[in-house]
């Protein structure tokens, strides 16, 4: 598992400090003695380090700490900057990269407070003292009056708060999202208090009371669409007495059931009059309907509890707002609507398709208003490629509302729509220049616009239409007419659910406005969205292509012409009485309205207002309400619909096909009854309401009763919020990392528990394990087999390597005999004597002969018997055992013949350092001769006799006086003190001079033969390795795992302080430990990812991909694995120390002579492990279990291991078959496939060779998330892609692991990256032809896929057979690699979880690209982070650098920011900020590479004071992992 650390910083910052090598324990420094050990002591041959190495490691740790401190300081500084400027977006980016809010802010940046004019001050003063509706022309500065009023209210509010009064806030209400952005930007530029802006698309309907309370506490002004405040009031998130000012923008909308009117009726008028907020309304005209002007205006005053006011000095206003010159453009009478040739073809064949009816109606009407050319071209929009999925989905939805599955007639209709699209694509459209193709109305517009735009001009024009289609078609037409200086654009409203190609986003609206301001567009074809409130810059030509219907439309659209010399043109049909009457009507109405407003006396009292209010409320009282007393939250007929929608959406996480409330309204006895149907998982499924006279009333009544029922069942809380939550997984932000560099002290087993079993008793039977030696070349002397006898049978151990003589590689083979050896007490005595004699003669240890305390016995093997004999007794050399039992040593007097002294093992009884093998008699030397000069110096160098003799000074004199000075001098081989034969000799050990000359009399001749003694000298290394195997197997047994010994030990072996840091100078390397866990951990990590992915997939059918990722993260994170390992005490089985000459001796014996190592054993029973190491061992055990196989399936034991180490109910499988048995087939999978799905299955089988039993699975695998599930009727591919991703990882890792047994995990990871990269998988998707089957709902995506497919196919054609052609192309759209992974997931599930299906796919379609992996050696190095690391390390020779990342958390719903920094010698050379650690690090690396681009090594070292070239070794770049 990659390391991950998240730390708190300054109370609100989480930093990430990654892959930091562990710091040394500076308080426990080791001192290495270089002097000769004192007489009589065993010396240590361990060379674990020196002072220079410790100093180097201390420096590395210090550098890491300094870098971490530097980064945390930087992160804190940047966090303050980011949070302090959170309300001020970065505006220096191109418009295309800015958010909508930033676009608005950029346009208003620098627009400071304007000087109020006299009429504005006049209205402001009136608004301070009473509720006021300001009626002023568009462009006269109504918003500025609102700003002045807000400043006044806020000032008083701050005073009230200081005096202890409850806080109140101001609301600026708007009628559209567009205005919310615009007005919020204006207020932020003019107020010094926090201003928030909200609209429905932000998901405010799902916010909790706590979220709202936070917003109310932190903002003085809130700009929002009116329905948001209405819902807050009804849900009692805020009360009317907590509001000090209500500003209604475009106040003329306050009528009927508009949210403005409902706020007044349902909340404002119900509040205590003394606690109501001030009201300020703004409008260009107080009415927007036809009828009695005075009556409508008076009613508006009543509804808003306000007085209409305008300036008493209209001349001042006219100086500011100049009226445009009004013109009437007359066009000839239009022809009646008629059917064009294309219309006739489509009507005849497809006129019965309901989804196309709106298009038929428009095109028929357009033939008259716009002309046949525009009418026909409308079909190109309606049946474009990006619209077809919408139409198809609409057909499916309608069909399935009647029956399920989709009937064949619906499928046929879908096919017919596609056929219609093909007809339109192949249709030859006439040129608009052909006579008769354009209507007289359009021809006139063309002529007029040519006059304005045929020469260079500063004219800016807006052409208003009533219909979105008309604006779009005019834009399309004038884009092709080639009027020299006309730059057309289109601005239409946002409408959800538009299925005929007219939909736009808020962002597209703003971009159009931005381009209009800048002049990039100078003629805007717009609908009413451009009439009202939008701050469109001055333009000098406004054309009403379609006439206004009301006074407000006339006033608003005329107000767009603000230039000093503007023209306002109304296009009217010649001889059309209705058009002429409308012109007169609006002008007279405007005069009457102005007269009414201007003649209002200042102190006028609105007579009859109480009765008017009563009549308003009476209509509401006829409708029921339901109030929750605890909070005051109110349920009304209108709010019930929103509450039910919110409740239904809260069940979305249950993966409903359609998480929405369904209303079915049916006629009944001259009235209507509505049935409410809630999503399937709702405990209350709905009800049927009471009859009502209108459909809308029936629907509201049923919704109201349903909400009451939900409340009764406690499914709605005290604020009418659902008790369910469409929640993000609870652990999405959990701190699941552990500190990779933190070390703790843990107990460590030094001996297996096997040795303690039955210890203290004399055995009657023993089990034999024969130990043999197979050298790679002849040794200097024979090494005879020995037998290890134990109370219990030992497992079969793998062979392993030791290094004998001068590093001759020798294989140690152990063979465990099945049958037990029954022994007598005499035989046990022989065995005990021999074992104790080995410790005495060979290792200078004298133990009390207590055979019951021995954990094992060592015996010589019989050389004459076959190794295959199963009888342990016949394998043992009992004659030699008897000889050794009877003779403690061989007296030299028994061998008067000098030849008898040759090929003996002799030892110094006083000094354990001196053991020899005798080789020859040297007749040229005598005992009295001085030792040859090449011999190592000893204390006494007077003679060879004196050189050989050890012992005290007094004993020496006596011995020398009586010894035989005529005895021969023997040439011998000094046995090295080296005990760790598991590793090759160190240089120090090689430098030891082993040739020596001694006299035999001061020494003892061992009764143990030379060939047995030679084998016994290897016994410490052998028993150390066997101990390690046994301890590792015990560790596996604690998890109930049956693992092969070699893999078990490898999984538990950590041979350095930083084993997990590959290709890095290893710290405190432990020699001779064999393979460490890193490769197994890499393999286990991959299997863990796959196993948990499968388990989550089968156990949680309702979870989405995000749930899967978060839940898998919780399972596989180092923190979880560490906690499991801690609980099961796996740390004690971990082998973190190499061979120790102190701990190999058996426990429990009584030492009589020799160095006592018990203190050393106690000290070495603890070891320091990083927390990450403990977690890594868990993954390595999974890898070991995988290699060990299973009883029925190769993965069985690994599955069991995953369950053991994750310790979670989310993974309970004990074998592979448990996955299949746990999987409940979802309904969509088992439903009968339709014709499309059967055809898809056949085509994909032809391409890939696998036949799906459930074609709907394949359908799901190829369904993009953009494709509406209600249309597709199968889930999108995200769940299957999640599963397939892990399967692909596993099959690729498995292939590399076995093909390259000697490659380290970093190499394997880097080359796996190529195999699973999006770049390769995208190319593979195109190669296999899968891209043509993707079902999506995105026009840009279609274009991206087409362009990529063309590029990758061209690259393959030009590659001349090279398999890496995909490397040179651009990255594919992500949907293509996702398709491949989803296909694998689908095939895997379809095959009942047969991994063979994944392997077959890999062998057939993937393996051929990766036979030669050297091609991809540089693949990973192209990554900016890897490239930076290589440059710093290899080119500059620098090792003191790091790349760190830290996350700055924000409030719920906010955008996460992550800062990454490259630090070189405590200097931050580059930074990058992004939404994730991964991309932040890429940005920081790219910037760092840019900084270093032309910098040579000398300049680098001078600039950053780098002296790393003088240091030993290199350290890794601290790159960590993505947050």
Curated annotation (Swiss-Prot):
Secretion signal, residue range per the UniProt entry: none
Q: Which InterPro entries match?
A: Dicer_dimer_sf, Dicer_dimerisation_dom, DSRM_2, Helicase/UvrB_N, Helicase_ATP-bd, Helicase_C-like, P-loop_NTPase, PAZ_dom
Work out whether the entry's keyword set contains RNA-binding. yes
Q: Which Pfam families match?
A: Dicer_dimer (PF03368), DSRM_2 (PF24995), Helicase_C (PF00271), ResIII (PF04851), Ribonuclease_3 (PF00636)
Biological processes, Gene Ontology terms: defense response to virus; regulation of defense response to virus; siRNA processing
Dicer dsRNA-binding fold domain residues: 640-730
* EC nos: 3.1.26.-, 3.6.4.-
User: Which residues does Zn(2+) bind?
Assistant: 1438, 1465, 1506, 1508
Residue positions binding ATP: 136-143
The residue stretches assigned to a coiled coil in this entry are none
Q: Where is the RNase III domain?
A: 1031-1190, 1241-1392
Gene Ontology molecular function: ATP binding; DNA binding; helicase activity; metal ion binding; ribonuclease III activity; RNA binding
> Which residues does the UniProt record annotate as the domain Helicase C-terminal?
444-617
Q: Which residues form the Helicase ATP-binding domain?
A: 123-304
Residue numbers marked as site, Important for activity: 1374
CDD domains from the entry? DEXHc_dicer, RIBOc, SF2_C_dicer
Q: What does the record give as the function of this protein?
A: Dicer-like endonuclease involved in cleaving double-stranded RNA in the RNA interference (RNAi) pathway. Produces 21 to 25 bp dsRNAs (siRNAs) which target the selective destruction of homologous RNAs leading to sequence-specific suppression of gene expression, called post-transcriptional gene silencing (PTGS). Part of a broad host defense response against viral infection and transposons.
Name of the featured protein: Dicer-like protein 1
Q: Which organism is it from?
A: Aspergillus oryzae (strain ATCC 42149 / RIB 40) (Yellow koji mold)
Gene name, please?
A: dcl1
């Amino acid at each position: 598992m990659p390391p991950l650390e998240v730390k708190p910083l300054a109370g609100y910052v989480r930093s990430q400090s990654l892959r930091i090598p562990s710091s040394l324990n500076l308080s426990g420094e080791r001192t290495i003695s270089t002097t000769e050990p004192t007489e009589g002591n065993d010396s240590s041959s361990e060379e674990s380090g020196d002072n220079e190495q410790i100093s180097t490691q201390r420096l590395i740790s210090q550098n890491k700490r300094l870098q971490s401190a530097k980064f945390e300081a930087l992160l804190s500084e940047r966090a303050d900057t980011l949070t302090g400027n959170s309300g001020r977006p970065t505006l220096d980016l191109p418009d295309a990269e800015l958010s909508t809010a930033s676009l608005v802010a950029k346009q208003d940046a620098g627009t400071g407070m304007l000087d109020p004019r006299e009429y504005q001050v006049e209205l402001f003063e009136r608004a301070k003292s009473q509720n006021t509706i300001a009626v002023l022309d568009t462009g006269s500065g109504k918003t500025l009056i609102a700003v002045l009023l807000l400043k006044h209210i806020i000032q008083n509010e701050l005073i009230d708060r200081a005096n202890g009064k409850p806080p109140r806030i101001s609301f600026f209400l708007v009628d559209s999202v567009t205005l919310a952005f615009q007005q919020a930007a204006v207020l932020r530029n003019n107020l010094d208090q926090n201003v928030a802006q909200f609209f429905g698309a932000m998901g405010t309907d799902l916010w909790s009371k706590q979220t709202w309370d936070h917003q109310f506490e932190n903002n003085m002004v809130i700009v929002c669409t009116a329905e948001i405040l209405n819902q807050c009031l009804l849900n009692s998130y805020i009360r009317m007495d907590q509001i000090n000012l209500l500003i209604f923008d475009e106040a003329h909308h306050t009528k009927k059931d508009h949210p403005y009117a409902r706020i007044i009726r349902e909340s404002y008028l119900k509040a205590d009059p003394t606690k109501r907020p001030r009201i300020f309304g703004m409008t260009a005209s107080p009415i927007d309907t036809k009828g009695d002007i005075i009556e409508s205006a008076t009613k508006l005053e009543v509804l808003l509890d306000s007085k209409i006011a305008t300036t008493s000095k209209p001349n001042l206003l006219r100086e500011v707002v100049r009226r445009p010159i009004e013109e009437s453009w007359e066009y000839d009478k239009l022809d009646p609507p008629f059917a064009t040739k294309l219309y006739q073809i489509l009507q005849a064949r497809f006129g019965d398709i309901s989804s196309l009816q709106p298009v038929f109606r428009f095109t028929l009407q357009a033939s008259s208003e716009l002309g046949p050319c525009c009418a026909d071209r409308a079909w190109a929009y309606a049946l474009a490629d990006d619209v077809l999925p919408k139409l198809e989905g609409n057909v499916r939805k309608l069909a399935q509302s009647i029956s399920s599955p989709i009937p064949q007639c619906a499928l046929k209709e879908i096919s017919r729509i596609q056929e219609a699209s093909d007809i339109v694509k192949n249709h030859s459209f006439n040129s608009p220049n052909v006579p008769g193709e354009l209507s007289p109305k359009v021809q006139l517009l063309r002529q007029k616009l040519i006059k304005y735009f045929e020469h260079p001009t500063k004219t800016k024009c807006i052409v208003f239409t009533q219909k979105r289609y008309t604006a779009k078609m005019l834009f399309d037409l004038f884009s092709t007419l080639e009027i020299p200086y006309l730059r057309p654009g289109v601005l239409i409203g946002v409408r959800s659910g538009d299925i005929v190609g007219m939909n736009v986003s808020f962002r597209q609206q703003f971009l159009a406005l931005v381009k209009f301001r800048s002049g990039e567009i100078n003629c805007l074809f717009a609908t009413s969205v451009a009439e009202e409130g939008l701050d469109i810059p001055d333009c000098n030509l406004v054309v009403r292509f379609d006439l206004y219907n009301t006074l407000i439309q006339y006033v608003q659209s005329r107000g767009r012409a603000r230039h000093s010399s503007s023209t306002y043109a109304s296009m009217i049909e010649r001889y059309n009485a209705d058009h002429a009457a409308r012109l007169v009507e609006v002008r007279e109405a405007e005069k009457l309205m102005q007269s009414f407003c201007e003649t209002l006396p200042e102190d006028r009292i609105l007579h009859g207002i109480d009765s008017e209010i009563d009549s308003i409320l009476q209509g509401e009282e006829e409708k029921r309400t339901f109030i929750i007393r605890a909070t005051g939250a109110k349920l009304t007929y209108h709010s019930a619909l929103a509450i039910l929608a919110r409740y239904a959406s809260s069940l979305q996480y249950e993966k409903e096909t359609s998480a929405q409330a369904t209303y079915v309204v049916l006629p009944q006895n001259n009235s209507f009854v509505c049935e409410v149907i809630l999503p399937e998982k709702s405990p209350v499924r709905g009800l049927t309401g009471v009859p009502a006279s209108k459909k809308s009333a029936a629907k509201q009544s049923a919704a109201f009763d349903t909400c009451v029922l939900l409340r009764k069942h406690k499914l709605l809380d005290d604020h009418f919020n659902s008790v369910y939550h469409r929640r993000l997984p609870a652990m999405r932000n959990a701190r699941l990392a552990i500190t990779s560099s933190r070390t703790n002290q843990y107990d460590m087993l030094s001996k297996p528990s096997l040795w303690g079993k039955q210890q203290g008793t004399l055995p009657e039977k023993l089990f034999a394990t024969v130990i043999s030696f197979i050298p790679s070349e002849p040794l200097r002397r024979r090494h005879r087999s020995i037998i290890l006898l134990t109370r219990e049978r030992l497992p079969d151990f793998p062979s392993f390597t030791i290094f004998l003589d001068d590093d001759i590689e020798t294989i140690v083979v152990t063979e465990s005999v099945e049958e037990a050896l029954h022994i007598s007490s005499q035989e046990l005595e022989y065995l005990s004597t021999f074992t104790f004699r080995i410790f005495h003669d060979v290792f200078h240890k004298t133990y009390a002969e207590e055979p019951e305390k021995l954990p094992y016995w060592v015996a010589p093997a019989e050389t004459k018997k076959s190794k295959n004999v199963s009888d342990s007794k016949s394998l043992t050399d009992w004659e030699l055992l008897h000889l050794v039992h009877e003779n403690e040593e061989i007296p030299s007097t028994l061998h008067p013949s000098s030849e008898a002294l040759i090929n003996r093992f002799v030892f110094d009884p006083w000094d354990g350092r001196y053991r020899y093998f005798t080789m020859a008699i040297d007749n040229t030397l005598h005992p009295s001769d001085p030792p040859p000069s090449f011999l190592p110096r000893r204390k006494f160098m007077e003679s060879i006799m004196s050189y050989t003799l050890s012992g005290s000074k007094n004993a020496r004199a006596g011995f020398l006086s009586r010894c035989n000075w005529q005895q021969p001098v023997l040439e011998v081989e000094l046995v090295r003190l080296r005990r760790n034969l598991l590793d090759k000799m160190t240089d120090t050990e090689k430098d030891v001079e082993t040739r020596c000359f001694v006299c035999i009399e001061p020494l003892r001749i061992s009764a143990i033969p030379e060939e047995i003694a030679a084998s016994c000298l290897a016994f410490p290394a052998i028993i150390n390795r066997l101990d390690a195997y046994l301890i590792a197997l015990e560790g596996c047994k604690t998890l109930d795992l049956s693992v092969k010994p070699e893999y078990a030990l490898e999984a538990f072996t950590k041979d350095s302080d930083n084993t997990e840091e590959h290709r890095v100078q290893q710290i405190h390397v432990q020699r001779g430990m064999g393979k460490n866990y890193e490769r197994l951990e890499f393999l286990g990590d991959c299997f863990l990812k796959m196993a948990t992915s499968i388990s989550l997939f089968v156990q949680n059918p309702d979870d989405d991909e995000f749930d899967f990722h978060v839940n898998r993260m919780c399972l596989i994170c180092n923190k979880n694995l560490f906690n499991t390992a801690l609980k099961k005490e796996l740390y004690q089985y971990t082998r973190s120390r190499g061979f120790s000459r102190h701990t190999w001796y058996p426990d429990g014996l009584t030492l009589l002579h020799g160095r006592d190592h018990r203190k050393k054993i106690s000290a070495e029973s603890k070891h320091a492990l990083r927390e990450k190491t403990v977690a890594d061992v868990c993954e390595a055990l999974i890898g070991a279990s995988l290699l060990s196989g299973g009883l029925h399936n190769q993965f069985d034991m690994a599955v069991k291991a995953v369950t053991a180490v994750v310790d979670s109910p989310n993974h309970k499988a004990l074998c592979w078959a448990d996955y299949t048995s746990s999987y409940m087939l979802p309904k969509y999978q088992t439903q009968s496939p339709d014709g499309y799905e059967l055809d898809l299955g056949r085509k994909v089988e032809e391409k890939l060779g696998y036949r799906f039993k459930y074609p709907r699975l394949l359908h799901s695998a190829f369904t993009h998330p953009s494709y509406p599930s209600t249309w597709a009727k199968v889930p999108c591919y995200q769940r299957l892609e999640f599963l397939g991703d892990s399967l692909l990882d596993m099959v690729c890792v498995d292939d590399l692991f076995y093909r390259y047994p000697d490659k380290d995990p970093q190499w394997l990871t880097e080359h796996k990256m190529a195999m699973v990269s999006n770049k390769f998988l995208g190319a593979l998707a195109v190669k296999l032809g899968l891209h043509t089957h993707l079902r999506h709902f995105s026009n840009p995506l279609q274009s991206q896929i087409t362009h990529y497919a063309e590029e990758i196919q061209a690259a393959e054609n030009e590659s001349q057979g090279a398999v890496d052609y995909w490397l040179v192309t651009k990255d594919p759209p992500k949907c293509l690699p996702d398709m491949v992974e989803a296909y694998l997931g689908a095939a895997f599930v379809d095959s009942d979880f047969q991994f063979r299906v994944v392997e077959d796919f890999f062998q057939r379609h993937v393996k051929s690209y990766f036979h030669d992996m050297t091609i991809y050696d540089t693949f990973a190095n192209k990554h900016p982070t890897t490239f930076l690391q290589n440059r710093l390390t290899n080119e500059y020779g620098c090792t003191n650098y790091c790349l760190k990342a830290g996350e700055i958390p924000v409030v719920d719903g906010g955008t996460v920011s992550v800062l990454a920094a490259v630090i070189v010698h405590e200097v931050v050379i580059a930074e990058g900020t992004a939404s994730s650690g991964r991309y932040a690090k890429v940005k920081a690396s790219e910037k760092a590479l840019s900084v270093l681009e032309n910098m040579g090594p000398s300049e680098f070292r001078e600039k950053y004071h780098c002296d790393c070239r003088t240091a030993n070794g290199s350290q890794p770049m601290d790159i960590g992992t993505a947050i």
